[in-house]
């Protein structure tokens, strides 16, 4: 069957528009994930990941992901995929993170490694291409890392991107485009964007201060100067403190014993402080001298800052003080629209139910604590009442004993 040219071009266009999905992981096949993910053996005490949907979730199966399970541990786990280069195309890295343990210090980011990585020896110093995701440590560090390896050096973003720090699942997305622009999204909403060259120090500055330029010696940057016609008044200088004129030597003051008496000093009401001449506009003022700039001879533009020869491994290489973080819904693609749709179909579908379950658990916990407090108070009141009753019984017995002792002498007299 022969196809018309317009139809053929249309089909080719549809084929070209299909997203390239380089890596996708949702952990929907039980323990089979252990066949795809490799634990590093670089250290013997790396923390263990387990498959879990956590203490609360929107869907028991869909929300299962890799959860850190041991406190105060480094973690090193990775999964490989068919190597690819992002040259000439958009790169989208996306995943969900849930810090249900109310994390105080720990990473929630991923690293993308080039081909050639020894997964069983992956560790903190293994060279990576991109590091992206949230990092929390105390109140001072709650940021989204976006780090690129450029010519062997890890370069951090110059902006501060705030991450989510609650207990719910959040969707993190990094988009790197072939025009050297980028975008960071959280929960499918843009939180930062811009130019790679502007927001990272990949390249030397375009302009530098002219090394041959210098501020002229007669350049006056003083906006105000002392009035040369102003002079200090003759009666200006007065001591700051003077002897108290109202003070009197005590009558019992013995100069042989106490020494010569000196009156206490007080603040001088006539003291005016340091004299300063009044200020006037400087007639020679030229403003702040600005060092002229020239083109930096060491600057050379790079149209391929965004590009890497190969991506082949996604790794979780991080430290956590308090475990419990769940990673899920990993996606690496070249299609921004597909990534947004995938996020809406995963995180977007279960987020409301997750919050409802957490709210229900919190309410149940609140009621349980109220009931426990009520029961504890009732027990304390019962114990107090029992103590009061015992005290009353003791007092009654003591009274009876005293009455018996009072009656005993009379009985003895009658017997006599």
From Swiss-Prot:
This is Calreticulin. An alpha-D-glucoside binds at residues 109, 111, 128, 135, 317. GO terms for molecular function: calcium ion binding; carbohydrate binding; complement component C1q complex binding; hormone binding; integrin binding; iron ion binding; molecular sequestering activity; mRNA binding. The keyword Thylakoid does not apply. Residues 191-255 are annotated as: 4 X approximate repeats. It comes from Mus musculus (Mouse). Belongs to the calreticulin family. Monomer. Interacts with GABARAP, NR3C1, PDIA3/ERp57 and TRIM21. Interacts (via P-domain) with PDIA5. Interacts with PPIB. Interacts with SPACA9. Component of an EIF2 complex at least composed of CELF1/CUGBP1, CALR, CALR3, EIF2S1, EIF2S2, HSP90B1 and HSPA5. Interacts with CLCC1. The keyword Signal applies. Residues 259-297 are annotated as: 3 X approximate repeats. It is found in: Endoplasmic reticulum lumen; Cytoplasm, Cytosol; Cytolytic granule; Secreted, Extracellular space, Extracellular matrix.
